[in-house]
């Protein structure tokens, strides 16, 4: 399910072959195993976890109000935005898209809390802002 849509997004965004990091990490994530990866910029780290997470999410065929199924923590606002954009880009051809909320500084914490309460499948957050939100609860 959704493999054709993911493959179409890969083609539309000029992805041809997986990088070595993606070849190692994607199977681990699909097996629901943790992976800690350190590699240089541009090595494909983000796609190595975003793609299998989207595949696993799509296979579950969740119904009803969205609930947080995925939490991605990033050290910086810029990286959180990059990861969020990757989720959007790779799910662009899905008929049912995952609901994504970015929890980052520089935006209204009240609106972010409201977005979470409305329901979301994926949260991408900076650690600092997530701690701020948890302190408010």
Question: Can you describe what each PLM-predicted range is?
Answer:
Residues 1-38:
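Conserved pre-motif I regulatory segment
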Residues 5-8, 63-135:
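Conserved nucleic-acid-binding Ia/Ib motif block in the N-terminal RecA-like helicase ATPase lobe
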Residues 23-35, 46-64, 86-91, 131:
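Walker A/P-loop NTP-binding motif
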Residues 18-20, 27, 52, 75-77, ...:
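Proline-centered helix-kink/hinge sites
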Residues 39-43:
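The conserved Walker
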